[in-house]
């Protein structure tokens, strides 16, 4: 069973993916971390504008060394959005994601193009979204715990910018797969969102 969860930045898809995977005993891959890791590598090398360097970083990425906490900063999130728009980076990471999904028992993957590009034959496809304001508030609370200088206005502006870039990039733009189920979490808490998502998964399992 492959469960594909897509959606824009800070929509809650990663939290849902982790919860669903844990509940069903499946492996989970937050594919956004892959792009964050590539973005972080480029930032560290001072080569965010170097497309060849970003493609090489994607090709040599070791998923076993990913550190979610260190990768969840505003600067790395912005860098991830930049490198994710590059076809060469996406191509380098597609095979890695598909190998992960090909586990005999199945897997849960969340990202921007799982249901539309990576796993078009997924058993279940969810498209998780929320209003930009709600997503900005969620991301702001995450960042404020680590960065006292974080501001809601800056986070909201970043959300709008990332939405624009994700939706209009040439390589695998953010789109809802035609056979995906829409889940709007604007007015749902974590537990309510999980219950709604799990109900969709259970229906698909029959």
UniProtKB/Swiss-Prot annotation:
A GO MF annotation of the entry reads: CMP kinase activity
Record keywords: ATP-binding, Cytoplasm, Kinase, Nucleotide-binding, Transferase
Annotated transmembrane regions: none
Q: What class of enzyme is it?
A: transferase
Q: Does the keyword ATP-binding apply?
A: yes
Describe the reaction catalysed, as an equation. Answer: CMP + ATP = CDP + ADP; dCMP + ATP = dCDP + ADP
Example GO biological process term? pyrimidine nucleotide metabolic process
Question: What do the Gene Ontology cellular component annotations say?
Answer: cytoplasm
Span of the secretion signal?
none
Which Pfam family, any one, appears in the UniProt record?
Cytidylate_kin
Query: What NCBIfam families does the record tag this protein with?
Result: cmk (TIGR00017)
HAMAP family documented for this protein: Cytidyl_kinase_type1
What family does this chain come from, according to its entry?
Belongs to the cytidylate kinase family. Type 1 subfamily.
Q: Please give the name of this protein.
A: Cytidylate kinase
According to the entry, what is the taxonomic lineage of the organism? Bacteria, Pseudomonadati, Pseudomonadota, Alphaproteobacteria, Hyphomicrobiales
């Amino acid at each position: 069973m492959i469960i594909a969860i897509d959606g824009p930045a800070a929509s809650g898809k990663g939290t849902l993916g982790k919860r669903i995977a844990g509940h069903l005993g499946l492996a989970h891959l937050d594919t956004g971390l892959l792009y964050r890791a590539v973005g972080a590598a480029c930032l560290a090398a001072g080569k965010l504008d170097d497309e060849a360097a970003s493609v090489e970083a994607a090709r040599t990425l070791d998923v076993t060394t990913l550190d979610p906490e260190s990768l969840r900063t505003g600067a790395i999130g912005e860098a991830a959005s930049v490198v994710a728009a590059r076809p060469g980076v996406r191509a380098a990471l597609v095979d890695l994601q598909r190998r992960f999904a090909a586990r005999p028992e199945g897997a849960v993957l969340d990202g921007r193009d799982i249901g539309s590009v990576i796993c078009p034959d997924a058993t279940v496809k969810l498209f998780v979204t929320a209003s930009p304001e709600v997503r900005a508030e969620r991301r702001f609370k995450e960042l404020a715990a680590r960065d006292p200088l974080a501001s809601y206005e800056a986070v909201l502006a970043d959300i709008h910018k990332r939405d624009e870039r994700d939706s209009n990039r040439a390589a695998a733009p953010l789109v809802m797969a035609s056979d995906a189920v829409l889940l709007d979490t604007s007015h749902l808490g974590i537990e309510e969102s999980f219950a709604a998502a799990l109900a969709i998964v259970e229906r698909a399992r029959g």
